[in-house]
């Protein structure tokens, strides 16, 4: 890999991470968009793992990516299931009303 390719890939990863942060701060009311923004940030971090794994010729980063993507998929499925149940009970999905959960 040339230094230009590494710089471009790291810049692309930074842009993805920044879009995730921006999505969280712009839409503070919608829980689903916040969840997608967090997943986008996790994707950017995994992309960094892939870049440095290829750069250092080490397979640990790629194995770690598979592990984290598996856990992220399970986490997203559980989060969406909780949101669907919350929507059926309350009729609205908003950050303001999530504090009314009892547990």
Curated annotation (Swiss-Prot):
One annotated GO molecular function: NADH dehydrogenase (ubiquinone) activity
Topology relative to the membrane: Multi-pass membrane protein
E.C. code: 7.1.1.2
Compartment(s) where it occurs, according to its Swiss-Prot or TrEMBL record: Mitochondrion membrane
Gene3D superfamilies: 1.10.287.3510
Entry similarity comment: Belongs to the complex I subunit 4L family.
Function of the protein: Core subunit of the mitochondrial membrane respiratory chain NADH dehydrogenase (Complex I) that is believed to belong to the minimal assembly required for catalysis. Complex I functions in the transfer of electrons from NADH to the respiratory chain. The immediate electron acceptor for the enzyme is believed to be ubiquinone.
Source organism of this protein record: Acanthamoeba castellanii
GO BP field: ATP synthesis coupled electron transport
This protein's UniProt keywords: Electron transport, Membrane, Mitochondrion, NAD, Respiratory chain, Translocase, Transmembrane, Transmembrane helix, Transport, Ubiquinone
Protein name: NADH-ubiquinone oxidoreductase chain 4L
Enzyme superclass (EC): translocase
Positions of disulphide bridges: none
Gene that this sequence comes from: ND4L
Entry's Gene Ontology cellular component terms: mitochondrial membrane; NADH dehydrogenase complex
